[in-house]
Design a protein with these regions (language model features):
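Short loop-beta-helix segment that forms the pyridoxal 5′-phosphate
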Residues: 81-82, 96-122
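Active-site phosphate-binding strand-loop segment of PLP-dependent enzymes
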Residues: 167-221
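N-terminal "arm"/small-domain region of PLP-dependent enzymes with the aminotransferase-like
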Residues: 5-76, 218
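Active-site PLP attachment segment
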Residues: 241-275
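Conserved PLP-binding catalytic core of the aspartate aminotransferase-like
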Residues: 312-319, 326-360, 383-385, 416-421
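PLP-dependent enzyme catalytic core of the Aspartate aminotransferase-like
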Residues: 57, 61, 65-74, 90, ...
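Structural motif of enzymes handling amino- and sulfur-group chemistry
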Residues: 288-307, 313, 317-319, 326-327, ...
Length: 421
């Protein structure tokens, strides 16, 4: 009997080899130094359009100084769970600040936004008993997702049977959601959607969706990872939609985008958050945000609240960048948010475009299947606050040379993102 190597028996070797040959997997690139508007990879300098920490706080001298001072006071880690030791002071401060900003009673922080999403789904579909008297059972809940919700939400709900306990409505389509809610009847329902979607920059019809949730007595959960501290001010786009945000029962935020650090949080009424500490599992049973990170995040939030011009100026530059790409005839997403997606099309072309931009000194994120539908590959661009006008123009010209002549002067109206249904 021939002995088959373990890797072959499980299929990992064949999976990796075939994925590499088809361009789905590549050898990891070594990044040296900090991630910012410029980046060094394998010893070579690049203008970086791949980062999500677009305001550059992790390079800000004042933030770095404050972080180091917090390290001296609180150490590098909590050293234990909040259940056994108590809530670390920086976490308490951060949670109170987020609650105040979002207009909610209480907030629970997590080590990442993904853990917040995983914990939420786990808590809302859980059966748990402390004793015969003290328990909860929500296994009969039905979750209704926008079909373009983040992978972490779909992954968290993978234990639910699609079509029964897990349903999906067409992206940003309130009419389709209404149809589903009508069919759900009086079952306990939770509608899950995002404020701003990361691949195509689309913004949800927040008010219309929450109107339906209230009408059908469904709970609402907004993943505000990409909208937190960005929209909601009168002088900014989408002000009307974001005025409805705090009507949601639950708001999840990420600290890796506008705040530029790591961590996530869920804000809601106190009874939900008190229960989530136990039921989520991803807060109490795993590591928390580092105390100095929580401290620095709170300071950044306060600065963004006090100095609105920081975000105002950034959003204006993002719109100017978007218009520059439109003027080149590039096919980009419809929604004028700070996330700009440039359509490439065929998956086979996507890797060629990435390699050509790489050779010109640009680091860009290419989204291809399975991140999007087959042959709807795109470049997801987020301008960095510290990109220079020269860098932006040089990059726009490179895109024009590569894609401008092959794309009609129209916007991306039919982009349909793949889901994990």
């Amino acid at each position: 009997m021939d002995i088959v190597p373990k890797a072959d028996r499980w299929g990992f070797q064949d999976f990796v080899e075939s994925s590499v040959s088809e361009g789905f997997l590549r050898e990891p690139v070594l990044m040296q130094g900090m991630s910012g508007s410029r980046i060094t990879r394998n010893g070579l300098p690049y203008v970086n359009f791949s980062g999500i920490n677009y305001l550059g706080w992790q390079q800000d001298p004042q933030v770095l100084d404050a972080f180091c001072e917090s390290v001296k006071r609180y150490g590098l880690s909590t050293g234990g769970s909040r259940a056994t030791q108590g809530v670390c002071e920086p976490h308490f401060r951060l949670e109170a600040l987020i609650s105040e900003h979002l207009g909610k009673e209480k907030t629970l922080t997590f080590a990442s936004g993904m853990l917040a999403n995983l914990g939420f789904i786990n808590a809302m579909t859980a059966k748990f008993n402390f004793s015969p008297r003290s328990g909860i059972d929500n296994r009969d809940a039905v979750l209704i997702f926008d079909r373009d919700c983040h992978w972490s939400l779909w992954k968290a709900a993978s234990h639910l049977k699609y079509g029964e306990s897990l349903l999906a409505f067409k992206h940003n389509d309130a009419a389709d959601l209404e149809r589903i809610l009508n069919n759900v009847g009086d079952r306990k329902a939770i509608v899950v959607f995002e404020s701003v979607y990361s691949s195509d920059g689309s913004v949800a019809p927040i008010g219309a969706i929450l109107d339906l949730c209230e009408r059908f007595q469904a709970l609402s959960y907004i993943d505000d990872a990409n909208g937190f501290m960005v929209y909601g001010e009168p002088q900014r786009n989408f002000y009307e939609e974001f005025q409805h945000l705090n009507r949601a029962d639950f708001i999840m935020i990420s600290l890796s985008k506008s705040i530029g650090l790591e961590g996530g949080a869920i804000s809601a009424n106190a009874e939900y958050i008190d229960a989530f500490e136990v039921l989520s599992g991803t807060s109490i049973f795993t590591a928390a945000i580092q105390p100095p990170t929580a401290d620095a995040a709170a300071s950044i939030i306060e600065q963004l609240k006090q100095e609105s011009s920081i975000m105002d100026d950034y959003l204006k530059r993002s719109l100017t960048f978007r218009q520059r790409l439109l003027d080149s005839g590039l096919q980009i997403n419809d929604t004028p948010s700070y996330i700009t997606s440039v359509l490439i099309g065929k998956d086979s072309k996507a890797e060629q475009v990435r390699e050509q931009l790489d050779a010109q000194g640009f680091c860009v994120p290419i989204f291809r299947y399975p991140a999007v539908k087959p042959n709807q590959a795109l470049i997801r661009l987020i301008l960095h606050r510290h990109h220079t006008d020269v860098e932006i123009e040089r990059f726009a010209q490179s895109l024009d040379d590569l894609l401008g002549s092959n794309n009609a002067r129209s916007r991306l109206g039919e982009l349909q993102l793949a889901t994990a249904q």
